């Protein structure tokens, strides 16, 4: 998938950031991970399950409008943090990150997320679109 090479490189940049253990670009409608990076065990399965957090937020969004547009959602577990960042509305794509509980420079990482969002937008605007990996068309993960 040559048109996704830059996107995959940007995803790897996110995972290489100190404290980040894994990332996935997940489609909100299907809950399927399109692209995954990182060495954390089961990053794909966890990311696909975590999209349910995003769906809950979306269902409750009318009650949260006074807070402004959502920029991220984070869930803290005893061993890790799962953070979700919107990337695109059509198709609905969310970046899911699994991070260490220790200090992560989230503002600096957010700048890198901005570059990733731009890579997603550029692929969509170029008319080339984002290619789902072929194995995900029939995959029944999770």
What do these predicted regions represent?
Residues 1-21, 30-142:
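Acidic, low-complexity cytosolic segments
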